[in-house]
């Protein structure tokens, strides 16, 4: 199966509407919760574990919605949004790889470190997600390590991010 290796914002928003992948009902969040503008590379066999990688970018502008409310007079991107982007990308990888139809849900992570912040004068956030394990049974679970860089400086690191793909989320 030939797969695309980069995605535009329009294609990512099509995923939010359930229009991009015919084999799955998994979706990315819609605006404003979609936390990246494009996927610049996604590969099934990359990374130090050979399980796959996905890289994405978010263009930073002073008018992004979160700067107006977090915090008044001290605008900063909430750390949880960067972490959520890492979960979004892990779930996107599972859907892209054809693992299973299902609804993606964040299941946790082993470790998170914040060593910097995203301010309105920044230009670019990059996400680098490296898959470390994929369990494909009744429940598909993806595990990844990820880092977030602002203007080429690493500011977040997450280890053992976990995303599950559920056929039914009512009992979750």
Curated annotation (Swiss-Prot):
Q: Where is it mostly found? A: cytoplasm
What is an example of a Pfam family matching this protein?
FabA
Q: Sorted alphabetically, which HAMAP family does this protein's record hold? A: FabA (MF_00405)
Q: Name one GO biological process term.
A: unsaturated fatty acid biosynthetic process
What family name appears in the similarity comment?
Belongs to the thioester dehydratase family. FabA subfamily.
* Isomerase listed as a keyword: yes
Function, as annotated, reads: Necessary for the introduction of cis unsaturation into fatty acids. Catalyzes the dehydration of (3R)-3-hydroxydecanoyl-ACP to E-(2)-decenoyl-ACP and then its isomerization to Z-(3)-decenoyl-ACP. Can catalyze the dehydratase reaction for beta-hydroxyacyl-ACPs with saturated chain lengths up to 16:0, being most active on intermediate chain length.
Q: Which reaction does it catalyse?
A: a (3R)-hydroxyacyl-[ACP] = a (2E)-enoyl-[ACP] + H2O; (3R)-hydroxydecanoyl-[ACP] = (2E)-decenoyl-[ACP] + H2O; (2E)-decenoyl-[ACP] = (3Z)-decenoyl-[ACP]
**What are the recorded GO MF terms, alphabetically?**
(3R)-hydroxyacyl-[acyl-carrier-protein] dehydratase activity; trans-2-decenoyl-acyl-carrier-protein isomerase activity
Q: Does the keyword Lyase apply?
A: yes
Biological pathway = Lipid metabolism; fatty acid biosynthesis
Name of the protein in its database record: 3-hydroxydecanoyl-[acyl-carrier-protein] dehydratase
Leader sequence segment:
none
Compartment(s) where it occurs, according to its Swiss-Prot or TrEMBL record: Cytoplasm
A cellular component term, taken from the record's GO annotations: cytoplasm
What positions does UniProt annotate as the active site of this protein?
Answer: 70
List UniProt keywords, sorted A-Z: Cytoplasm, Fatty acid biosynthesis, Fatty acid metabolism, Isomerase, Lipid biosynthesis, Lipid metabolism, Lyase
Q: What is its EC number?
A: 4.2.1.59, 5.3.3.14
Q: Which cysteines are joined by disulfide bonds?
A: none
Q: How does it assemble?
A: Homodimer.
Q: Which residues form a coiled coil?
A: none
Q: Supply the InterPro entries for this chain.
A: FabA, FabA_FabZ, HotDog_dom_sf
């Amino acid at each position: 199966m030939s797969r695309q290796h980069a995605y535009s914002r329009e294609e990512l928003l099509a995923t939010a509407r359930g229009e991009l992948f015919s084999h799955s009902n998994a979706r990315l969040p819609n605006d404003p919760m979609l936390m990246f503008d494009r996927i610049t590379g996604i590969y099934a066999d990359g990374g130090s574990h050979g399980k796959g990688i996905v890289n994405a970018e978010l263009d930073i502008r002073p008018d992004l919605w979160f700067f107006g409310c977090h915090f008044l007079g001290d605008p900063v991107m909430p750390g949880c949004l960067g972490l959520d982007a890492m979960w979004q990308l892990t779930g996107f990888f599972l859907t892209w790889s054809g693992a299973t139809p299902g609804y993606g849900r964040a299941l946790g992570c082993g470790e998170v470190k914040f060593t910097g912040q995203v301010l309105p004068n920044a230009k670019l956030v990059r996400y680098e997600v490296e898959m470390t394990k994929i369990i494909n049974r009744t429940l598909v679970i993806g595990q990844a390590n990820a880092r977030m860089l602002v203007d080429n400086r690493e500011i977040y690191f997450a280890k053992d991010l976990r995303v599950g793909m559920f056929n039914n989320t009512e009992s979750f």
